[in-house]
């Protein structure tokens, strides 16, 4: 694979390039993988990245596809993409006998948690969390790579129910917006399982579709027109078949794909080394701030941190007080703690000012308003790795690695031509059987 970004090469040599880009020798052990996705939940990304993933299943030993959404995503959304893959499978299998049969993929597709975790971070076992435990306990010397593209509840539940599996796991977590929806499950893992091997990618993933070489057929829209549309059922589905919330996406986003390329190129065992997946630094103490009062915009917290608000329900509160913290497009359910106080958690995915309102059946809480300001982590944060998180990495906060204000995005987009070349080569396999 070239070590510096370049232009997409002519289509005739894509197949030759693919053999190099896959990174692993034909007989080398393939990495074991479970993908946890919120496909059908909050955005297009997962459907596009599922297409990418399925085209890579000759290189990966895929052991599970879990539906772990925030929102309306369900197992059936994954199965629909597998149905599209089934139409290309006759061609794909001529290029590599390692492509799994569609029925084999359907058999490992499981339903995970459909609700956000409560304050405790865990709720109950699910088919998805139990599948993680089952796979992790198999007699296999290879680590089990968990790619979390959506809610992290099933991973949290698996660790809660079977903490013995922790040494076997290697996790790449597309955090940021997903942490925003599921802060309690994330906080449970960070505080109760700090020895977990984890890449917490909060914003670097945005380099997949922001910045880098966008000239010619490398732009998000022109690449799809030139190298995706007309490339089998998967290509046509990607180029015009992904409808979500009344809109059809026809350009690249693929925001979960850095987790896939983590295992395709570079050294997966060393997140500090450059690669298509991004380049990460040891995590500093995971920011967690607690306020026992209504906050104001003068209160500053770190972007992607866990913000906790603790308020008394007041003397006239009902026997069973209820409350929600309404902030932007979220309505966060409060939890009454042992002392009777109401607790809320929130994670800001952007560096900006936020306003919130509390809705409650407790008169002292209902209608309260407040604010806070989220700020980007200081570059110096990377100089103080947390000894309590020995196997935890996150985005490089240095200005040199920012694309605009996107932290770490340049560690991904510098490779744009290379990872798009690899994707195009895989799509070529859908067009016709191997001669």
Would you name each region that the model predicts?
Residues 24-435:
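N-terminal acidic, glycine/proline-rich low-complexity segments
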């Amino acid at each position: 694979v070239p070590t510096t970004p370049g232009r997409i090469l002519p289509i005739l040599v894509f197949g030759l390039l693919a053999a190099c880009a896959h990174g692993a020798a034909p007989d080398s052990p393939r990495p074991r993988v479970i993908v946890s996705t919120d496909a059908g939940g909050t955005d297009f990304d997962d459907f596009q990245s599922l297409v990418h993933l399925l085209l890579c299943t000759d290189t990966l030993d895929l052991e599970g596809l879990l539906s772990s959404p925030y929102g309306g995503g369900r197992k059936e959304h994954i199965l629909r993409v597998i149905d599209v893959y089934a139409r290309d499978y006759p061609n794909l299998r001529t290029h590599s006998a390692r492509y799994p049969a569609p029925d084999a993929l359907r058999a490992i597709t499981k339903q995970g948690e459909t609700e956000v975790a409560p304050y405790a971070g865990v709720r109950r076992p699910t088919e998805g969390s139990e599948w993680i435990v089952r796979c992790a306990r198999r007699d296999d010397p290879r680590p089990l790579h968990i790619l979390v593209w959506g809610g992290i509840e099933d991973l949290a539940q698996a660790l809660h129910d079977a903490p013995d599996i922790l040494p076997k796991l290697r996790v790449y977590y597309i955090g940021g917006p997903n942490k925003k929806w599921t802060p309690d499950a994330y906080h449970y893992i960070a505080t109760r399982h700090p020895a977990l091997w984890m890449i917490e990618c909060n914003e670097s993933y945005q380099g997949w579709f922001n910045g880098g070489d966008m000239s010619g057929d490398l732009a998000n829209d022109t690449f799809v027109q030139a190298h995706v549309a007309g490339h089998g059922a998967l290509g046509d589905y990607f180029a015009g078949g992904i409808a979500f919330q009344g809109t059809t996406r026809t350009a690249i986003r693929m925001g979960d794909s850095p987790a896939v390329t983590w295992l395709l190129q570079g050294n997966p065992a060393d997140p500090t080394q450059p690669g298509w997946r991004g380049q990460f630094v040891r995590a500093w103490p995971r920011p967690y701030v607690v306020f026992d009062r209504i906050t104001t915009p003068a209160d500053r917290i770190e972007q992607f941190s866990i913000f906790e608000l603790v308020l008394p329900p007041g003397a006239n509160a009902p026997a069973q007080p209820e409350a929600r913290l309404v902030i932007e497009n979220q309505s966060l359910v409060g939890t009454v703690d042992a002392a009777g106080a109401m607790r809320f958690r929130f994670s800001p995915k952007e560096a900006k000012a936020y306003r919130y309102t509390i809705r409650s059946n407790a008169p002292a809480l209902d209608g309260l308003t407040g604010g806070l300001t989220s700020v980007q982590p200081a570059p110096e944060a990377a100089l103080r790795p947390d000894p309590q998180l020995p196997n935890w990495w996150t985005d490089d906060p240095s200005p040199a690695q920012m694309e605009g204000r996107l932290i770490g995005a340049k560690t991904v987009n510098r490779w744009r031509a290379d990872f798009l070349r690899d994707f195009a080569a895989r799509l070529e396999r859908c067009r016709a059987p191997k001669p």
